[in-house]
């Protein structure tokens, strides 16, 4: 377990020194605190006979869902440095298993072996050389700190001018944007002689004019109320001031 943790610590210190934000003393202090934290975490979750057991628990991971690894953050707090000064990639995964440490930059990239151990008694210099060789084999794209999510976002933001023109709203004519006026209300004509046929069925009125189209026939006259003259019933007559009923004048 010591060799694997040493490989992880060398891996982080190499990245931090490349970022060149911290002094040598701060980097060494961070490496010491991280070593103690990982040793305490892994001591009861280390299974040499079955290396894959507890792999998720020992994994160190940073991605868009987990921006900061809690163990690395704790090492920063214990060494009085800022997490942002480490300069770690936005997507980084380290699998710390018995006899092997693997790494992956970005969620969609292939993993590579940081260090593998056949001999438990390897010294720190040999471990450091293994980690250095592994990092040197990684391309510069891995070290740029770009993530797969950033690449997807940048691709989405790139819009061709032709696509903007094609997606623009079509030019509408003014007549298409103005709704036709509501038709005026006209009363139905009164019934006239001859509106009913001999079979008892009423003739149909002309079909209504579709909404929005002018009437092609004769113009309808505006509605005018018909004056009503009241005619007194038979037997009643009036004088100048009031109506007189002749039955009321009969002797009792």
Swiss-Prot record:
Give me the ranges of the annotated region Disordered: 138-162
Q: Which InterPro entries match?
A: Anti_prolifrtn (IPR002087), BTG (IPR033332), BTG-like_sf (IPR036054)
Source organism's superkingdom?
Answer: Eukaryota
- Tissue and organ expression note: Ubiquitous. High expression in the ventricular zone of the developing central nervous system. High in ovary, testis, prostate, thymus and lung.
Which Gene Ontology BP annotations are present?
A: negative regulation of cell population proliferation; negative regulation of mitotic cell cycle
User: How far does the signal peptide extend, from start to end residue?
Assistant: none
Q: Which GO terms describe its cellular component?
A: cytoplasm; nucleus
What family is this? Belongs to the BTG family.
Give the protein's function: Overexpression impairs serum-induced cell cycle progression from the G0/G1 to S phase.
Give the protein name, as stated in the record.
Protein BTG3
Q: Which organism is it from?
A: Homo sapiens
Gene name tied to this protein: BTG3
């Amino acid at each position: 377990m010591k060799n694997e943790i040493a490989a992880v610590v060398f891996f982080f210190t190499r990245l931090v020194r490349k970022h060149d934000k911290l002094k040598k003393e701060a980097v060494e202090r961070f490496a010491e605190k991280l070593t103690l934290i990982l040793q305490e975490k892994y001591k009861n979750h280390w299974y040499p006979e079955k290396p894959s057991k507890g792999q998720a628990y020992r994994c160190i991971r940073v991605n868009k869902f987990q921006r900061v690894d809690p163990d690395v953050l704790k090492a920063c707090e214990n060494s009085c440095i800022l997490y942002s000064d480490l300069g770690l990639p936005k997507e980084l995964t380290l699998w710390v298993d018995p006899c092997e440490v693997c790494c992956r930059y970005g969620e969609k990239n292939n993993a590579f072996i940081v260090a593998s151990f056949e001999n438990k008694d390897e010294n720190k210099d040999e471990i450091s050389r293994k980690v250095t060789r592994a990092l040197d084999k990684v391309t510069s794209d891995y070290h740029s700190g770009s993530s797969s999510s950033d690449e997807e976002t940048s691709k989405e933001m790139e819009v061709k001018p032709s696509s903007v023109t094609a997606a623009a709203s079509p030019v509408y004519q003014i007549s298409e944007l103005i709704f036709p006026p509501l038709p005026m209300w006209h009363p139905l004509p009164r019934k006239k002689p001859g509106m009913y046929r001999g079979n008892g069925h009423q003739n149909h009125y002309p079909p209504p004019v579709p909404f929005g189209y002018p009437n092609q026939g004769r113009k309808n006259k505006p509605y005018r109320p018909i004056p009503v003259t009241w005619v007194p019933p038979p037997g009643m007559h009036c004088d100048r001031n009031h109506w007189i009923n002749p039955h009321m004048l009969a002797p009792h």
